[in-house]
């Protein structure tokens, strides 16, 4: 059961699937029930007088928890970017958070998108009706504008046909073209060949990389082209804003049917890693405290951030994850209500 505009898991489509028509007033509630069933271990129906009762069974055992890092290899990789501090590990939590709501949000706002893995997950998996994501960095924004605004095939072809050598890479990275398409390609190349995916200007090129492949160790042209094309094929589910995430939050803060995911440039190493790194964190907490809709933040696990969360009465929880060097560490999830968290 789904409306024609709704995306649902492919596993729901089988020879046993029956298509039914229901009044619009029932559609959202029925879709919510279906998603709840899909994320639980099972269900049973029983009759009581003139009432049909649906009982959800115990939730399936999940492969993550507050002290058990997510195996990121089990999570779909959808972004063309690789980021230090990327949020692929957070995807199962995002699913649980958005599915825990009684009604699906009208929109999800990701105010500091970067590689936008949360936005892409929500859009691809139909976790919200629409996704709006925002990025202040002009070079990263150039990529998203190209991917979503009709020139994705040019970028995919450029990546597929590029002869990656150190000399060719340096020529592109030292280029000064202000044309949007060229800036987008230069940004993708920079992200893929500079050490650690660091986006700040001046970072060195990869030297050894995977299996001694050097500069080619993170350059997978077929994969990058496929991801870009797949995102473009679903472009109607996304809106991209180049600008300040604070402005986007303010624009939608009075809407109770908007959910906000916030992953700002972190307080520890942001200046070294990113070009758009300077964020007023107290102002961010203040602005979210005024939002009518739900929100989820991911943050450094630091004394300063904990103090901010406590001062605004937000709940917080340390979540196990692994960094790019596979070292186990924790980050904070912060929200008004974290009772949906498992483990």
Model-derived features: where do they sit?
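Long, positively charged, glycine-interspersed low-complexity recognition regions
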Residues: 16-18, 267, 274-343
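Short active-site oxyanion
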Residues: 18, 104-108, 128-130, 235-239, ...
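Short amphipathic alpha-helix starts
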Residues: 18-27
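Conserved S-adenosyl-L-methionine
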Residues: 23, 104-164, 263
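A short, Lys/Arg-enriched interface patch at domain edges and termini
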Residues: 27-44, 338-343
């Amino acid at each position: 059961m789904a409306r024609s505009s709704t995306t649902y898991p492919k596993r729901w489509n089988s020879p046993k699937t029956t298509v039914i028509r229901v009044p619009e007033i029932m559609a959202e509630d029925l879709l919510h029930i279906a998603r709840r069933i899909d994320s639980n271990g099972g269900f049973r129906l029983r009759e009581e007088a003139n009432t049909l009762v649906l009982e959800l069974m115990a939730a399936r055992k999940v492969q993550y928890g507050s002290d058990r890092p997510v195996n990121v290899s089990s999570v779909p990789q959808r972004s063309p970017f690789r980021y230090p501090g990327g949020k692929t590990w957070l995807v199962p939590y995002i699913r649980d958070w958005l599915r825990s709501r009684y009604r699906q949000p009208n929109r999800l706002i990701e105010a500091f998108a970067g590689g936008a893995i949360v936005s892409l997950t929500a859009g691809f998996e139909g976790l919200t009706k629409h996704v709006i994501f925002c990025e202040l960095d002009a070079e990263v924004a150039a990529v998203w504008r190209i991917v979503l605004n009709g020139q994705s095939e040019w970028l995919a072809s450029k990546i597929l046909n590029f002869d990656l050598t150190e000399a060719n890479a340096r020529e592109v990275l030292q280029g000064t073209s202000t044309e949007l398409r060229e800036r987008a390609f230069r940004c993708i190349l920079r992200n893929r060949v500079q050490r650690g995916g660091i986006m700040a200007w001046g970072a060195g090129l990869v030297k050894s990389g995977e299996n001694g492949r050097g500069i080619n160790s993170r350059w997978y042209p077929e994969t990058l082209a496929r991801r870009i094309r797949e995102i473009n094929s679903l472009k109607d589910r996304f809106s991209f804003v180049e600008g300040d995430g604070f402005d986007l939050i303010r624009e939608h803060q009075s809407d109770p049917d908007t959910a906000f995911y916030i992953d700002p440039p972190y307080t520890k190493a942001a200046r070294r890693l990113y070009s758009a790194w300077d964020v007023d964190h107290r102002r961010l907490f203040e602005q979210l405290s005024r939002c009518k809709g739900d929100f989820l933040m991911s943050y450094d696990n630091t004394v300063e951030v904990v103090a901010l969360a406590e001062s605004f009465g937000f709940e917080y929880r340390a979540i196990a994850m692994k960094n790019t060097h596979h070292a186990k560490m924790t980050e904070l999830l912060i929200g008004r209500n974290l009772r949906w968290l498992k483990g």
